[in-house]
From Swiss-Prot:
Highest taxon in the source lineage: Eukaryota
Protein species of origin: Phyllomedusa tarsius
Pfam families the UniProt entry points to: DD_K
Record's function text: Antimicrobial peptide with activity against the Gram-positive bacterium S.aureus, and the Gram-negative bacteria E.coli and P.aeruginosa. Probably acts by disturbing membrane functions with its amphipathic structure. Has an activity of stimulation of insulin release, which may protect the species from being eaten by predators by causing fatal hypoglycemia. Has hemolytic activity (60% hemolysis at 128 ug/ml).
Additional notes on this entry: The primary structure of this peptide is identical to that of Insulin-releasing peptide from Phyllomedusa trinitatis (AC C0HLC4), and Dermaseptin-B4 from Phyllomedusa bicolor (AC P81486).
Protein family (similarity comment): Belongs to the frog skin active peptide (FSAP) family. Dermaseptin subfamily.
InterPro entries tied to this protein: Dermaseptin_dom (IPR022731)
Cell compartment(s), UniProt: Secreted
Residues annotated with Glutamine amide modification: Q28
Protein name per its UniProtKB record: Dermaseptin-2
Tissues expressed in: Expressed by the skin glands.
Sorted UniProt keywords: Amidation, Amphibian defense peptide, Antibiotic, Antimicrobial, Cytolysis, Hemolysis, Secreted
Amino acid sequence: ALWKDILKNVGKAAGKAVLNTVTDMVNQ
């Protein structure tokens, strides 16, 4: 289903954003 793909992409994007935020915090 299309909404499942959208949900998956949103989840991936959110995971990447969280990962980037954590990495930035660690690097500071």
